[in-house]
């Protein structure tokens, strides 16, 4: 399972780097999907979220007996699968312009995270109810956290 968790960390890191490079400029155009965000705001938020993802992965690896650690990790896995579709894929289709994060979302996050989830099912580590509830809870927390991180990023960045 260590390799699968490492692949998750690799995938989310590349995805967040893609977003960090191009999303701040992309967000400046009028859109229903994203309010304009500065590089400082976004970079701060994406670093914190990446750190939380790594913490969830390491928590699962080092505390395999902890249901909470497992739920947070599978919540991140599921949330990042959904994130590839909404907003990235839907924004690209609706706006007829590439939304940063789509490529890594479709080519890395969906297959890698789906593989990790599949392996967890094979090893009887999770059931559907845990995956669905964890994805919803972690997804809602991340959605609520993002605007707060943007505000903090604006304050702490030079």
From Swiss-Prot:
Lineage summary: Bacteria, Bacillati, Bacillota, Bacilli, Bacillales
Transmembrane segments: 42-62, 71-91, 102-122, 130-150
Keywords, sorted A to Z: Cell membrane, Membrane, Transmembrane, Transmembrane helix
Locations listed in the record: Cell membrane
Membrane topology designation: Multi-pass membrane protein
KW Phosphoprotein (keyword) present: no
GO CC field: plasma membrane
Protein name in the entry: Uncharacterized protein YrkK
Organism: Bacillus subtilis (strain 168)
